[in-house]
UniProtKB/Swiss-Prot annotation:
Pathway(s) served: Quinol/quinone metabolism; 1,4-dihydroxy-2-naphthoate biosynthesis; 1,4-dihydroxy-2-naphthoate from chorismate: step 2/7; Quinol/quinone metabolism; menaquinone biosynthesis
Cofactor binding note: Binds 1 thiamine pyrophosphate per subunit.
Subunit structure: Homodimer.
PANTHER family recorded: 2-SUCCINYL-5-ENOLPYRUVYL-6-HYDROXY-3-CYCLOHEXENE-1-CARBOXYLATE SYNTHASE, PROTEIN PHYLLO, CHLOROPLASTIC
Taxonomic path: Bacteria, Bacillati, Actinomycetota, Actinomycetes, Mycobacteriales
Reactions listed under catalytic activity: isochorismate + 2-oxoglutarate + H(+) = 5-enolpyruvoyl-6-hydroxy-2-succinyl-cyclohex-3-ene-1-carboxylate + CO2
GO molecular function: 2-succinyl-5-enolpyruvyl-6-hydroxy-3-cyclohexene-1-carboxylic-acid synthase activity; magnesium ion binding; manganese ion binding; thiamine pyrophosphate binding
Sequence ranges of Low complexity compositional bias: 195-205
Gene Ontology biological process terms from the UniProt entry: menaquinone biosynthetic process
Entry-linked InterPro entries: MenaQ_synth_MenD, THDP-binding, Thiamin_PyroP_enz_TPP-bd_dom
Listed name of the protein: 2-succinyl-5-enolpyruvyl-6-hydroxy-3-cyclohexene-1-carboxylate synthase
Organism domain of life: Bacteria
Organism: Mycolicibacterium paratuberculosis (strain ATCC BAA-968 / K-10)
Gene name of the record: menD
């Protein structure tokens, strides 16, 4: 067995021992040793291999697989720009704390700076965005040292896994594992081959690292009128469950929900912030109010204080006191009023908007389903229409909240969800998000494909979120409609046909029935929506409060 093949097989075996079950592979010549080793592991049923031609979407497919499976996922590619195309996914994985392992094949390092083809300084390319950038030395053709090399390769692979999963830091995230490979890049003929050097007995990892966790208890008195703000990565806090909670869709479902717009009707005396809230301006205003003490509870090491207003930080609350019944009743009434205001104005509004589409999707979900939300308006709309996330799983790329890669994320999340659960996956995304990652629809005929994924495209022909921001002020209409609205006139049905994906254009009133249809496989449901009246609709909702 030649050195590159031996090294690749050892690395793949150790990744599997460390918990990797899904790997995304992009074709190339330099990563051929890894490709052959991964294909062998796939045939043996040890991993599930997903082959993609676009590294950018491959990275987001891996993110979807990782967040839904709760396990590290690798994406392997050849050298050069193939590595650079992982940039957006690596950044998202960094801030969302997703265990993404970039297996970047490289030319031998002595070729750097010589003009060698498809060669660049790719080790360390991702800079501060990765937990670690780790390299293996070139595999030596030294049979007499194979035991020592085997130990070195396996130990390095375990180091990669520990960094990605955060087992020593409680801070999961992306890792670059750069592997220079020398020719020959394909396996030797079998009769002259040799078995892969062995790992630990019983399939154990070479170096086991038990997971560490932070524990920073924070004393909090619940007697003052308190609200909880739960953002992405909030975690569960049973001793806070009785408190009124503004929960973003990706946070754990609250026992005592409080609509984000209800904050306008209340004057809390203190706030407990969980995770990283990013969606609602009333929430941001409350967290920045110097008259309201804020206690921030997070599960990771990042500083959780955008406004500089937090009085203390920790990982869990040690509570004393109890909220007054009068405060709880007042919050319950405010929540009911806000929910009714939103639904009432939706019913009265003459045009279909993204909010209407979000309400139809939210109302059609069933226990066991998984919901993937686009990072622009859809995740906000789901919160505003009162999504009940009990008994469903909600995903959204909230690390840096870009719209890129959302189709691929949804496909990865669906594949992981179906491997462990019976429920469907429904993705709600906007048209720009869909078009931006339309290449994610490309799944080859030999590749694993979601069995129950429906992508709902709320199509208002452009960037609806800008209608609600300062750029959407009517004063700027002569400019904003073009440079922010970015109308595109893409034929969604034709785009889906190009990728052999079933699609249909339906009205919002038909969405619930369409989602209930069994429809095995992956499909797209397009709902035409209007964005020109979004500003008017949101103003009417605020007035109804």
């Amino acid at each position: 067995m030649n050195p590159s093949t031996t090294q690749a097989r050892v690395v793949v075996d150790e990744l599997i021992r460390g918990g990797v079950r899904d790997v995304v592979l992009c074709p190339g010549s330099r990563n051929a040793p890894l490709a052959f080793a991964l294909a062998d592991a796939d045939r043996a049923g040890r991993i599930r291999l997903h082959v993609r031609i676009d590294e950018r979407t491959a990275g987001y497919l891996a993110i979807g697989l990782a967040i839904a499976a709760g396990a590290p996922v690798c994406v392997a590619m050849t050298s050069g720009t193939a590595v650079a195309n992982l940039g957006p996914a690596v950044v998202e994985a960094n801030y969302a704390r997703v265990p993404l392992i970039v297996l970047s094949a490289n030319r031998p390092y002595e070729l750097l700076g010589t003009g060698a083809n498809q060669t660049m300084e790719q080790l360390g390319y991702f800079g501060t965005q990765v937990r670690a950038a780790i390299s293996l030395g070139l595999a030596e053709d030294a049979p007499e040292r194979l035991d020592a090399l085997n130990a070195t390769w396996r130990s390095a692979t375990c180091r990669v896994l520990a960094a990605a999963t955060g087992s020593r830091t409680a801070n999961a995230g992306p890792v670059q594992f750069d592997i220079p490979l020398r020719e020959p890049l394909v396996p030797d003929p079998e009769p002259h081959g040799a078995p892969t050097p062995a790992g630990r007995p019983g399939g154990r990892p070479w170096t086991y690292t038990p997971p560490v966790s932070f524990d920073q208890p924070l004393d909090i008195d619940l007697s003052p009128d308190t609200v909880v703000i739960a953002g992405h990565g909030a975690g569960t806090h049973p001793n806070l469950a009785q408190l009124p909670t503004v929960a973003e869709p990706t946070a754990p479902a609250p026992d005592n929900p409080l609509h984000p717009l209800a904050l306008r009707l209340l004057r809390p005396k203190q706030v407990i912030m969980l995770g990283r809230p990013t969606l609602h301006r009333p929430v941001s205003a409350l967290l920045a109010d110097p008259q309201v003490p804020v206690y921030a509870l997070t599960t990771g090491p990042r500083w959780p204080d955008v406004s500089g207003n937090s009085q203390a930080t920790g990982t869990r609350a040690v509570t004393t006191g109890a909220p007054s019944p009068a405060w709880l009743h007042r919050c319950e009434q405010a929540n009911r009023h806000a929910v009714a205001a939103v639904r009432g104005q939706l019913a009265a509004h003459p045009l279909t908007t993204g909010l209407h589409v979000a309400a139809a999707v939210a109302d059609a979900l069933r226990p066991g389903d998984q919901l993937v939300l686009g990072a622009s308006n859809p995740v906000r709309d789901a919160a505003l229409v009162g999504l009940d996330s009990h008994h469903i799983r909600v995903r959204s790329n909230r690390g840096v909240a870009g719209i890129d890669g959302t189709v691929s994320t949804a496909i990865g999340a669906a594949l992981a969800h179906e491997a462990a659960h019976d429920g469907r996956t429904v993705a709600l995304i906007g048209d720009l998000t869909f078009v931006h990652d339309s290449s994610g629809l490309l799944i080859g005929p030999t590749e694993p494909t979601p069995r129950r994924l429906t992508i709902v495209v709320s199509n208002d022909n452009g960037g609806g979120i800008f209608e609600l921001l300062e750029q959407g002020d009517p004063r700027f209409s002569d400019v904003s409609s073009r440079v922010f609205g970015t109308p595109h006139d893409v034929d969604v049905g034709a785009l889906c046909r190009a990728y052999h994906v079933e699609s249909a254009q339906i009205e919002v009133g038909e969405l619930a029935a369409a989602l209930d249809e069994p429809g095995p496989g992956m499909r797209v449901l397009e709902v035409k929506a209007d964005r020109s009246s979004l500003r008017q609709l949101h103003a009417a909702i605020k007035a109804a409060l």
